[in-house]
């Protein structure tokens, strides 16, 4: 019985292989390096995901609800939701009640909305009846650190098509450029203002720094309701999961 004892490489690229004959009970040679059994990765699904940040809850305009919702329009309530623990929070189950006692499951949110607050004032802007309200004068600073959110720039066509639509304290604003200025902080420019029928909010008053901000995408929870619920109070509960 023989075993491999060493392997040498020559300068010309050749190799010397040394074998050792084993006699009697000597059948193995101890390895130079030992091995360690692998344990693999076992996720702990019972880790507390923590609570949520204060959600941004609003009623979309008819135009916004009809275009950006799989519900096909109608009366709706939208909510931007994110977790306090941006590492462990995976989403939440949403429950609603009209009497504050009996709750029913309304849906499930997976992943956080890209939400936060503005860091600069957004001035009023005059409506342009002839076309889109393109604001090349003002920019908007936003901080999304509560949700660890990230924004990407688009094109002028994206902004005009409202592909980058955001909720800014009642006004819907789309943007072309998102300049990263710090961790989860951006300056948005080439703004399309007062979209989806929110011209009144655009012209009413300046929106100060600290105004709620949310990127309108698939991360927004949408709850329909019928006209018999107009004026009623709805209570919402958010059950987080990791």
Tell me what each language-model feature is.
Residues 1-242:
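Interface-prone segments of viral and bacterial extracellular assemblies
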């Amino acid at each position: 019985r023989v075993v491999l004892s060493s392997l040498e490489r020559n300068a010309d690229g050749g190799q010397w292989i040394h074998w050792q004959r084993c006699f009697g009970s000597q059948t193995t040679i101890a390895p130079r390096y030992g091995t360690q059994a692998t344990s693999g990765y076992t996720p702990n699904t019972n880790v507390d995901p923590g609570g949520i940040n204060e959600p941004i809850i609003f009623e979309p305009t008819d135009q916004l609800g009809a275009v950006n919702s799989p519900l096909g329009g109608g009366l709706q309530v939208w909510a931007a939701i994110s977790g306090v623990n941006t590492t462990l929070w995976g989403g939440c189950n949403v429950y609603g009640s009209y009497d504050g006692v009996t709750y029913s499951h309304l849906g499930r949110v997976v992943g956080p909305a890209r939400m936060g607050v503005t860091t600069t004032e957004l001035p009023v802007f005059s409506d342009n009846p002839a076309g889109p309200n393109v604001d090349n004068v003002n920019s908007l600073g936003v901080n999304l650190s509560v949700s660890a959110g990230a924004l990407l720039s688009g094109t002028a066509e994206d902004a005009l098509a409202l592909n980058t639509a955001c909720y800014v304290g009642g006004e819907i604003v789309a943007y072309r450029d998102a300049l990263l200025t710090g961790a989860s902080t951006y300056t948005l420019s080439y703004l399309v203002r007062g979209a989806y029928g929110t011209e009144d909010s655009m012209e009413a008053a300046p929106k100060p720094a600290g105004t709620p901000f949310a990127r309108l995408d698939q991360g927004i929870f949408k709850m329909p309701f019928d006209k018999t619920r107009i004026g009623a109070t709805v209570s919402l509960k958010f059950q987080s999961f990791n």
